[in-house]
Amino acid sequence: MGKVLAAALIGIAAALAAERLLAFRNRLNATREVDPVALPNCRLIKGIEAGSEDIDILPNGLAFISSGLKYPGLKSLAPDKPGEIFLMDLNEKKPKASELRISRGFDLGSFNPHGISTYIDKDDTVYLFVVNHPHQKSTVELFKFMEEDNSLLHLKTIRHDLLTSVNDVVAVGPDSFYATNDHYFYDFILMFLEMYLGLTWSNVVYYSPKEVKEVAAGFYSANGINISPDKKYIYIADIFDHNVHVMEKHADWNLTHVKTLQLDTLADNLSVDPDTGDIWTGCHPNGMKLFYNDPDNPPASEVLRIQNILAEQPTVTRVYAENGSVLQGTSVATVYNRKLLIGTVYHRALYCEL
């Protein structure tokens, strides 16, 4: 009897493990291959060799680019080099990327930048919020952009018990923001188990010096986050659920769910065109390839443009896609004056004229 029971339990465990593996592969789009969509006027951005995970463009055409992310389980092309923030002026005829100098006193050696967001105050001061992972922790670094000498003045480091595994932020004030925690755990083994078991423990947190609180939960992996031009809605990409959530923002900073747009790809960071309200997102057609790191079968790239997301039937257009021969692991796409920047988790960056 005992042997029969043991065999039954082993069989049940094996069946559950197989079901979880299948679900995990589906969340990663493990069998998808991308059909190419080419853009004619593109070039790789010189100087960006180790990632361009997130990009934020000011209304005047200055683009901030985070580079050098080291993320658990993912490849890094410069594992021993600190992260950097680059600047590009998209008004120039041939824009170039230049590294921004960061003020003394900031720990550059452990700088590991992830998502970024800018905020322009009433006096035109530009603040740059940078998700940082020093020593496998999560902080948000607040900088002031010093345009006269193209540098960043570090103002403060933000830590909080609710900011556990921060992926991205969207600034809503000079010292306040919404942040996505892409996992409950940050340790890679526990993070993998969380993904494998399909736990929906990821969330969104609102932070200000006076109040910190969870404002949305129940995501497989809340990733990119941004805000509508009218500041009424917050957009959240759940990368492993293949969708974008629209949340209404209230006066008390709480969020309520409005709708979910389902996609057939893994949407990473979200950028919003301030003129049209269109959402642009860098996507991973097949997330499994990000983790396998096979040089003969690299992760592909994909860029989507989402128009009229509040409509009953939003328009989703594949603007760019390729098999990884040019760009590997696209994480962001953003536009300014018919110029498109496409960034990656750990690879190069692309500049295109539309």
UniProtKB/Swiss-Prot annotation:
Give the binding site residues for Ca(2+) 2: D54, I116, D168
- Give any single GO term for biological process: response to toxic substance
The way this protein sits in the membrane is described as: Peripheral membrane protein
* Intrachain disulfide bonds: C42-C352
Active site as annotated: H114
Tell me which EC number(s) this protein carries: 3.1.1.2, 3.1.8.1
Gene3D superfamilies xrefs: TolB, C-terminal domain
* Cofactor binding note from Swiss-Prot or TrEMBL: Binds 2 calcium ions per subunit.
Binding locations of Ca(2+) 1: E53, N167, N223, D268, N269
Q: Which reaction does it catalyse?
A: a phenyl acetate + H2O = a phenol + acetate + H(+); An aryl dialkyl phosphate + H2O = dialkyl phosphate + an aryl alcohol
Q: Identify the keywords attached in UniProt to this record, alphabetized.
A: Calcium, Disulfide bond, Glycoprotein, Hydrolase, Membrane, Metal-binding, Signal
Q: What is its main location?
A: membrane
> For this protein, what is any one GO molecular function term?
arylesterase activity
The protein's recorded glycosylation sites are N29, N254, N269, N323
Q: Does the keyword Glycoprotein apply?
A: yes
Matching Pfam families, A to Z? Arylesterase
**According to its UniProt entry, what is the function of this protein?**
The absence of paraoxonase activity in turkey and chicken blood and in turkey liver indicates that PON2, if expressed, does not hydrolyze paraoxon.
The entry's family comment says: Belongs to the paraoxonase family.
What is the name attached to this protein's record?
Answer: Serum paraoxonase/arylesterase 2
Organism classification, top ranks?
Eukaryota, Metazoa, Chordata, Craniata, Vertebrata
Q: Which gene encodes it?
A: PON2
